[in-house]
Amino acid sequence: MPKIAHISDIHIRSLKRHDEYIDIFKKLSKDCADNKVDYIFLGGDIFHTKLTGISPEYIELLTWWLNDLSSIAPVHMILGNHDLNESNLSRQDAVSPIVSAMNNSNIFLYKKSGVYEFHPGWNWCIFSISDKEGWKSVKPMKNKINIACYHGPVSGARTETGYELEGEVTTSFFKDYDYAFLGDIHTFQFLGTKEIEIVVSEEELKNYSNYEIIEEVSQ
């Protein structure tokens, strides 16, 4: 069974707080390496301000970070609403040109909706926000592990202020998939399922930062 690091909503600014990003990125890379992850999945919103304010500093930081991650494991990415202009999809997004110029064979960006095998018997089922017309062709494959990948609000999700969202999809949208890798809403919460208790020691809690690693969960 492959071990996958699921990361989303990085929101790299044009100029601000880059020192903080570098510090966290280094810690994250070390965790991925120490835990010997097989794949790294980035679930969108790499950039923060859509198509405005793209700077040389942002390009430099993203290039360094993606190269660093890809030296640990293959990196698979989708776009988020902050990475593009959803009202004008003819415009280029804030990530694709950088990935294309890097020409790194260990980095994969999925802009088209579809089913993509990334590991023997394991599929990304991509519901791309830049290719909603293609959603209808995305179906889980029999006798495979299918991971639904989507960046956007799910109905019933709540923001950090407690506001309940009416998303474009509901939890039932993912009912035929083995897993769902989601992005967009930054608040940790449970949707359409009972809460899963994860037991950790007090010492481990002291080391909690902005992400966590769950080895295995049984219900």
Residue ranges and their predicted role:
Residues M1-K3, Y208:
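A structural preference for long, well-packed, hydrophobic secondary-structure segments
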Residues P2, I10, S14-G114:
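Core catalytic region of metal-dependent phosphoesterases/phosphodiesterases
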Residues K3-A5, N123:
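A fold-wide structural signal in alpha/beta-hydrolase
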Residues I7-S8, Y39-D45, P74-N81, F108-S113, ...:
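Active-site neighborhood of phospho(di)ester-bond hydrolases with catalytic His/Asp-centered motifs
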Residues H11, H82, G114-Y116, D131, ...:
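Residue-level detector of flexible, active-site-proximal loop/helix-junction positions
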Residues N35, N143, K175:
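Structured loop/turn residues at beta-strand edges in well-structured enzyme cores
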Residues D83-S172:
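Conserved catalytic scaffold of divalent metal-dependent phosphoesterases
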Residues V154-S155, E160-N207, E212-E215, Q219:
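Conserved beta-sheet core of the metallophosphoesterase superfamily
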